[in-house]
Structures are given as C-alpha cells and as structure tokens.
Amino acid sequence: VVIVDDEILGKPVDKADADRMLRLLSGRTHQVMTGVCLVAEGWEKRFSVTTDVTFKILSDEEINYYITTYKPFDKAGAYGIQEWIGYIGVTALKGSYYNVMGLPVQRIYEALNAKQ
C-alpha cells in the first residue's frame, strides 16, 4: 500500500481517482509498505517493509500523460516506479526499490536463508 498523510492509497478506481492520488503525492514524500508472510512446513515468518519515496512537483501535463499512456489502475498510489513516472518523478528513495515495485525480494531472500 501507499501511505501519505495517514491516508492509505490503494489502486485507483478510475482516471479521476488516479489524478487525485498523483496530485496528493506530487512534491512530497510518502511511504510504500508491503506485508509478507512466508510459510513452510513447521515454519512461518511475518514481516513488513517500508520504503520512503519522494516525488518532484508533477505538472498537470505529466500527470495527464502518465494516466493516459500507462493506465495505472492496477497499482497502489496510481504509479509504477519502474515506469515513466518513476524515471522523471522520483527524486529520492530511502529503502528497497523492489518493495516499491511490489515485492521486497532482498528481505524475502534473507528470511528464507535464515530459515536454513
């Protein structure tokens, strides 16, 4: 999930919702949080990973172009960091890039290796 000002941003339901979310994130830092539960016979590991992401101030044209071209309706917070908006919009990232993409693979790898 994407969190800004204590508001949880899920996937946008339409263009207007995506526009609202991107405007809310524009020029600010927000958090991306992923919960993970790994289960194997006789073993379970639960954790969450949080990454801070900062966007530049996005112009109306940039927001409209991104929504129209990339249709981010399947992404929490209405953006994919691995897409155009991430290339031009993200000015800082503190934490796991892969967490923002959707799965904190390094942390999962560490947890699985610690199991052995």
Question: Which stretches of residues belong to each language-model region?
Answer:
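Anionic-ligand binding patches
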Residues: 1-116
